[in-house]
């Protein structure tokens, strides 16, 4: 039976709203619900066995991401991809599992190529010694995780490295993209491209050299190292895709 209002205000209610929004978001991103197709609240409520309040909040979440729109007399309709907030971490996750997954991965790598070299240059010039040392520590943890062939450790260390890199730039606008970059890294690890390959040691070394350049205050070298790191990642993914790997 649908939950009552007290439950809707609780953690359980929020989880229900999240489940409905995520289920519909994945269907929209996969094309199961194409642009301009209607979404009927009553139908969704019956399908998920939730109240109108839960459905309404789930719809609000999707509308905030540009994926659906409610119009007077027209009802709620799926919006074209051009209307979606493609930088939203949830939208990135949902698209990653759909037909646009490969294209999105390449697009996000282009975004990283624009953001991370600039962040590296700023970070190297910042004089934020303590934060620079944190970046070097994250690079060291990345190396240990790769040596241990531990995907959870590797993922965590890589996320920490790139978060510190962008935060260390001191640029508030770049920092606004942290959620997007984190989602981009997640989509790379969940893309089907093998994580531990012959290129793993090279990638680990590139992270180390980038951290060293930043800690040394060499802005030119840091910018170049960051650009090389992202470009080599993109090349590896393309090569794996061409050879028959799944992205």
Residue ranges and their predicted role:
Residues 83-164, 202-225:
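All-alpha effector-binding/dimerization core of bacterial HTH-type transcriptional repressors
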Residues 36-37, 71, 154-155, 175-178, ...:
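Short, hydrophobic secondary-structure boundary micro-motifs
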Residues 118, 122, 171, 184:
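Phosphate/oxyanion-binding loops and surfaces in catalytic or ligand/nucleic-acid-binding neighborhoods
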Residues 1-115, 121, 243-245:
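Short linear motifs at protein or domain termini
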Residues 60, 124, 166-170:
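Amphipathic alpha-helical interaction elements
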Residues 12, 139, 143, 148, ...:
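C-terminal all-alpha effector/ligand-binding and dimerization domain
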Residues 19, 56-57, 128, 153-154, ...:
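Juxtamembrane/interface motifs at transmembrane-helix termini
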């Amino acid at each position: 039976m649908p939950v009552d209002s007290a439950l809707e205000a609780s953690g359980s209610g929020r989880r229900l709203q999240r489940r409905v929004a995520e289920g519909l978001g994945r269907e929209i991103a996969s094309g199961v619900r194409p642009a301009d197709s209607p979404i009927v609240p009553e139908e969704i409520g019956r399908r998920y066995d939730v109240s109108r309040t839960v459905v309404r909040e789930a719809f609000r979440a999707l509308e905030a991401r540009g994926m659906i729109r409610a119009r007077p007399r027209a009802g709620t309709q799926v919006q074209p991809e051009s209307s979606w907030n493609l930088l939203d971490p949830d939208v990135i996750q949902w698209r990653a599992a759909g037909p646009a997954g490969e294209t999105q991965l390449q697009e996000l790598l282009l975004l990283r190529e624009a953001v991370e070299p600039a962040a590296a240059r700023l970070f190297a010039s910042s004089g934020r010694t303590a934060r620079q040392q944190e970046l070097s520590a994250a690079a060291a943890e990345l190396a240990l995780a790769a040596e241990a062939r531990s995907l959870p450790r590797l993922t965590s260390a890589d996320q920490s490295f790139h978060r510190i890199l962008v935060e260390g730039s001191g640029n508030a606008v770049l920092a606004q993209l942290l959620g997007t970059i984190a989602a981009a890294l997640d989509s790379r690890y969940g893309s089907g491209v093998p994580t531990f390959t012959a290129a793993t040691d090279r990638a680990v070394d590139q992270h180390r050299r980038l951290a060293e350049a930043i800690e040394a205050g060499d802005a030119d070298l840091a910018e170049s190292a960051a650009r090389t790191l992202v470009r080599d990642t993109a090349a590896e993914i393309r090569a794996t895709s061409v050879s028959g790997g799944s992205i």
